[in-house]
């Protein structure tokens, strides 16, 4: 029997906390979060994610974090979605997401910034601060042009970095996701991400992809079926 529901699985993470969500017909159906460090075992990781999905669930899309973030969680997410693709869901569309792009979309949604505004997207994990610059091009949530590679930068040197792009703290809108928001208190126009709203952004993406509302140009911000991690620095063991 043909499946009449449109189901999407979301696997989001950058730190020790992994968020799983099942979206049915553009509505959030269920959510689970767990700490991958409490039981630091890859088999347990695979089991928890697999148990979240019913064997009878037909998935149209899988949205998953490619990074940047902690090496351990990014490696495990990538390994899991590869296994899912080749073992059970060969017809499912797998769409990798840049965490920095997602939080830039969060700023665009929550602050309703004007066209052509520059966005400094910052993700903090442990002692690392991953950054990327975007520019809003038109009145559309996902119409963000990426202007830089992902960098891992000491925030004390952020103005120097912005200067290489003829920007400064004064003329960018910044958005921050991480455990230490006080470290960006000196930023002008800074928005702190409420992690609970991240799923809202990804569900919006899911809905627009299902309904063919995202142009090929904007689609470049996604990393469909490449399964490439975005570490932002040389891999280690964190």
Question: What does each of the following model-derived ranges do?
Answer:
Residues 34-51:
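N-terminal phosphate-binding loop and adjacent alpha-helix
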Residues 51, 82, 86, 109:
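Short, well-ordered alpha-helices that flank and scaffold nucleotide-derived cofactor binding pockets
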Residues 61-99:
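DPxDG-like acidic metal-binding loop motif
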């Amino acid at each position: 029997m043909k499946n009449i529901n449109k189901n999407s699985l979301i696997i989001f993470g950058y730190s020790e906390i992994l968020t799983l969500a099942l979206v049915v017909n553009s509505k959030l159906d269920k959510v689970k979060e767990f700490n991958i460090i409490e039981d630091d075992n890859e088999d347990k990781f695979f089991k928890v994610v697999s148990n979240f999905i019913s064997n009878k669930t037909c998935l149209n899309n899988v949205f998953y974090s490619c990074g940047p973030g902690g090496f351990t969680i990014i490696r495990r997410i990538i390994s899991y979605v590869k296994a899912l693709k080749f073992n059970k869901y060969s017809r499912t569309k797998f769409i990798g997401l840049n965490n920095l792009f997602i939080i830039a979309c969060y700023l665009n949604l929550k602050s309703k910034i004007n066209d052509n505004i520059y966005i400094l997207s910052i993700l903090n994990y442990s002692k690392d601060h991953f950054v990327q610059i975007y520019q809003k091009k038109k009145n559309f949530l996902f119409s963000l042009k990426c202007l830089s590679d992902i960098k891992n930068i000491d925030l004390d040197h952020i103005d120097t970095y912005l200067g290489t792009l003829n920007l400064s703290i004064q003329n960018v809108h910044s958005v921050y996701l991480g455990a230490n928001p006080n470290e960006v208190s000196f930023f002008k126009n800074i928005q702190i991400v409420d992690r609970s709203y991240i799923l809202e952004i990804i569900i919006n993406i899911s809905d627009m992809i299902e309904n063919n509302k995202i142009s090929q140009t904007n689609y470049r911000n996604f990393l469909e079926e490449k399964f490439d991690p975005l570490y932002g620095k040389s891999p280690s063991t964190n």
